[in-house]
Amino acid sequence: MSRSHRSSGWDLLSLFEERLEESAEMPLFSYLGRNMDVREQYSVQRLHSEAAALAAVLQAQGLKGSVAALVYPPGSGFVIAFLAVIMAGARPAPLCRARSRDWHSIALTLRQCGAAALLVPSAVADSLPAEILTLRALQVLRTDTLQGDAAQWRRPVLASTDTCFIQFTSGSTRSPRGVDISHDNILHNCALIARAFALEEKDVGVSWLPFHHDMGLIGHVLVPLYSGVHNYFLSARDFAARPASWLEAIARYRGSISGAPDFAYALCVERIAQEQAALLDLSCWRVAYCGSERVSASTMARFAQRFAVSGFMPDSLMPCYGMAEATLFISARRGLQIHERDDGRCDVSVGYLDVQRDDPCIRIVSPQEGAECAQREEGEIWVKSRSVARGYFQDDAIDASVFNAWLEHDSGYLRTGDLGYVLDDNLYVTGRLKNVIKRRGRSFHAEDIEGEAMTLLHGQGVARCVAFDLETQGGPALVLLLELDGQIEAERVHARLPELQTRLWYTPGILVSRMLLVPERALPVTTSGKLQRDRSRECFLAGEFSHV
C-alpha cells in the first residue's frame, strides 16, 4: 500500500491511527525466542492499546513536550514505550546500554538532551548507578510496573514539523550527537524506503538489529508501521552467539526483507558451513540490504556464493547508503555494481542516481574548491532531501555549516563528511573526509588500508583492525592496530606482519610506522559495532592497549 501521497503534512500518530482503522487485527510484530518460536505477537490493535495505556501514565506525569530517554533490552517493551512517548506528546530518545561502563556516557547524553524522564524496565532500573539516580530533575519510570488506562489517554496535537524523536549518531568519528528527526522527516524516509524496496503488505521482514540503532528502529519498526509489513524479531545477542539463527528465521518465516551491516554477512560466511547452508531455503529473500558501514565487494560476493546452495539470488543484494542526519536512508542499488579502480581496489555502488527524481538530490563537491566534481572525481557527498533533519538537538552552533551548505546558487545541502564519486549514475562511497591520510602529495583512505590488511589477515588470526595517523616529532606516522580473534596463536599472526608491511608499501603504497597486535575485543566500538577511530587513537596515546 502506497502512502507517499500522505507523507507531507502528516505525523506518525496519524499514520498509526490510519493503520489501526484499516487493519486493527493484522499481526505487525512477532518476537522470537532462542529456539526461533514465536513467544509474543502484537497486532496493530494490541500495540495501540498498550501504547495508549502507557501514554496516559506519561501524560499524568507531566511529560508532554519533554524528552524521555529509553533504555531497553531486546523485546516488545521498547516499541511500546517509544510509541507511548510520542502518543503522550513527548519526544523519545533511544539509548543503548551494552555494558555497565556505558552508564557514564548515558549520563552525559541525558544531560545533553535535557531528558526529563528515563524509561526502563525493572531489570534495568535495578542496575542503575548513582550517577544516573542523582541526576537533577530526572524521573526514572519502571514502565513494566505502571498500570495505565488507555481510555484516559488524550491525543496530543502534533504538527509535521514537530520533533518526532531524537536519533543519536553512532559516534564512530566523534561523540554521539542527537539528530532532531521531525514527523515529516520520518514519514518521507519511510516513503523512500518503501519505494526503493518495492514494499507490499505481503512482504515479511526479519531483523535482529537493535532498536536503538536507526536501521533497527526505522527499518523494522516504523517502516512496517508505514507499509503494513509483518516483522519478526530475534535478539542481537542470539545472532551474535549463533549467526545461523538470522538465516534460519528468514527461511522459517519466509522473510522477504532483511539486512544488516557488512560485518554480519561476513560473519555468516565464516560461521555457517556449506553443508549447513544447504539445509536453508532462502529463495524467499528478495531484498538483502546492506548498510551502516562500508560495503565490501568481497563480502557480498562470498555471501552470494556461499548461500547459492540455499536458493539465495545474488540480485537480492541491495547495498545502501544513509546516515542519521538524513533520518536513515539516502540511496540504494539492487544487485552488485562493482567498479575496479586503477590500483585494483573495488568499490561497490550504493545507489543509482535517478535523474528523473529530485529527492534525494546527491552532489559530489570538492572540499577544497566548493564546486561540483566531474564524473569519477572524488569529493564530499552532499545531500538535499526532505528526509534531512533540521539539525542536531539543542546544538545550533554547527547546524548551518552542516545542514544548510551552499553550492553555487543552491542551498539546503547536508554535508555528509563522506567521500565518494559518481560513475555512470552510480554512487560509490570511498571513506570519511576526516580519515584521509596524506603522504607525498597523495591521499590514502584509512578504510582502504584497513581493507588491505583484512584481505591478508582475516581468518588468519585478526578479527578487525583500525588505522589512524599521528603527528610525531619526526613527522606524520601511520599506526595500525590489529585485534586478535582468539582462534589463532598470536605468534602466528606476528610472523605475518612483515608480509603485511610489504603489501601495504606496494599496495596502496604507504609505510606503516607502527603495528600493534592487541587482545581480543580490545578495540573500542560504537553500540552498532562500528570501530571508533578517534577513541582508538586516544587509547593508543594514553598507553591503554596491552600488546600481545
Per-region residue spans from a language model:
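Conserved C-terminal "lid"/linker of ANL adenylate-forming enzymes
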Residues: R464, F468-D469, V479-L480, Q501-V548
